[in-house]
Amino acid sequence: MKKIAVLFGGNSPEYSVSLTSAASVIQAIDPLKYEVMTIGIAPTMDWYWYQGNLANVRNDTWLEDHKNCHQLTFSSQGFILGEKRIVPDVLFPVLHGKYGEDGCIQGLLELMNLPYVGCHVAASALCMNKWLLHQLADTMGIASAPTLLLSRYENDPATIDRFIQDHGFPIFIKPNEAGSSKGITKVTDKTALQSALTTAFAYGSTVLIQKAIAGIEIGCGILGNEQLTIGACDAISLVDGFFDFEEKYQLISATITVPAPLPLALESQIKEQAQLLYRNLGLTGLARIDFFVTNQGAIYLNEINTMPGFTGHSRYPAMMAEVGLSYEILVEQLIALAEEDKR
């Protein structure tokens, strides 16, 4: 029986989301086909084979279950537990944001010679860096909102003022390399500017100031390596504010509609752009590609998630369910794609 190792946790602002997503993935893996190995990464970055109750993962008490936490070390082929070598057939890194989607875990798994679900090192790192992603998208004829890149060492107030004069308010101030809308502030006047910059810089050394696009957010899920399955597009509606971390995982005032109520021609255009990005950036396994669409039908790239949320109400599984892939089948196909990619 093949051994599937599911990774969760890590030193990331999205630690809690990872636990919830991973618990759902583990539940979906067929125990008659696969032996599941649950590997937790503590915020200290210590790795453990967790053999306790899955509910403890979901409610984040797994590290308190000491008798079921067995510390792992790495080898060039798998893991070492005591004197035993453990080599999973496929590793499913259900890790979001920092260290999970930025190429770090992918590089480690490459060094360990382990097949894994999702995009490779370069593609993961590129999609995490929104500024570089948008520069490359521009070469493909795919538009992004007007954006100013700032670094912790170069953030001239005069440059910021010129950007605001050119594009006006509202603007979004966001970390260049963070996921799940962490550290993002919608700014409507200068009084909130410095506070928003401080918040964003807490997540990294580079920050984006981006013109707010009036319209709706549309997502497009893609599954596959050579042969692609394009999921249904979804649309996000908010009573107020923007689709921040709390809205993404608690749905306080957000409504997600799948399939998105789009004219057929516009939907086709969005899917074409999503496929172009997926192919040209060398994405594999899965991704959710998010756009803004104005009332006039203009399309702007927002971001690409190379390991989108996998909770029970997450967008990516819902997109795939709409085209006939249940959560369980989706997980099984991702495992198969990882094996195919390694070959």
Curated annotation (Swiss-Prot):
Q: Which Pfam families match?
A: Dala_Dala_lig_C, Dala_Dala_lig_N
The record's remark on the cofactor is: Binds 2 Mg(2+) or Mn(2+) ions per subunit.
Entry binding sites for Mn(2+) 1: 290, 303
Question: What does this protein's UniProt record list under function?
Answer: D-alanine--D-alanine ligase of altered specificity, which catalyzes synthesis of D-Ala-D-Ser; produces a peptidoglycan which does not terminate in D-alanine but in D-serine, thus probably reducing affinity for vancomycin. Together with VanT and VanXYC, required for vancomycin resistance in E.gallinarum strain BM4174.
Instruction: Please give, as recorded in its UniProt entry, the membrane topology of this protein.
Output: Peripheral membrane protein
- State what protein this is by name: Vancomycin C-type resistance protein VanC1
What does the UniProt induction comment state? Expression probably regulated by upstream promoter elements. Part of the probable VanC-type operon associated with vancomycin resistance.
